Amino acid sequence: MTQPTHEKNHALEAARYALMRRLVPSLLHNMAGALQPISMTAAIMEKRLQSPTPDLILLGKSSTSFKAQSRDVADTFAHLATWLAPQSDQSIAVNAGVEEILGMMAREFSDRGFEIVNETKITTAEVPQTILRSVFMASLVALTDTAESPGRIIVTSIVTSVDIIGDADSSESDEISLTISLKGHPEMDKSIPVDVQRYRKLDWDDVQSLAKEEKVGIECTTHGVTLHIKNSGRVANEIKNVEVR
């Protein structure tokens, strides 16, 4: 039976909101980090101003530094805001996009005892940034949320050429397969609680909703998930829905 449109929209918006809520602590952490240099510079300026004979040259240098740091903070905040309102037409190389997301979520995964291994660094093919920031990131979170204990997260990528179906003239396009695997490791600290939650857990229904919206094929199990992305923006086949095993 086909799911009503309003129910699909509700599931999609619920998944987006849950992912955003899970992202907020990381955004706040990055904002605090960006503000730290300004705080230090302000403290130095205050100390110099309290001197009986302030050194105007040093104060001028501090003021120049303060202005430069303020611009950097503004740029950082503007960039962080794109995580909440991403541009749908923005593309990014797979290696850069994956590195960005793993860096953003590194603290949460570390706090929960997970180690991240990124093996996508040679994959320069471009994909829509919204796919990585929604489907890929949700897959990472869902996989760790459903894990019974901490482990090693391994991200790999493969680029293949596939036939595009549905055009008058059949052609080929690159398909990027991103695989996220979760493997146990004897040296992992099993005492670290996996369920350090700031909102609710993400599950595979959330991932499916986001994947369908972005036209990404997914195959998921309890030990990993593979995303099939067309960097041409066209989909070769219907999304393959695989039961979580």
Residue ranges with predicted function:
Residues 163-208, 229-231, 238-242:
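Glycine-rich/acidic phosphate-handling loop/turn and adjacent ATP-lid/helix
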Residues 212-227:
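Glycine-rich ATP-binding loops of the HATPase_c
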Residues 2-3, 8-12, 16-23, 31-71, ...:
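Histidine phosphotransfer helical core of two-component systems
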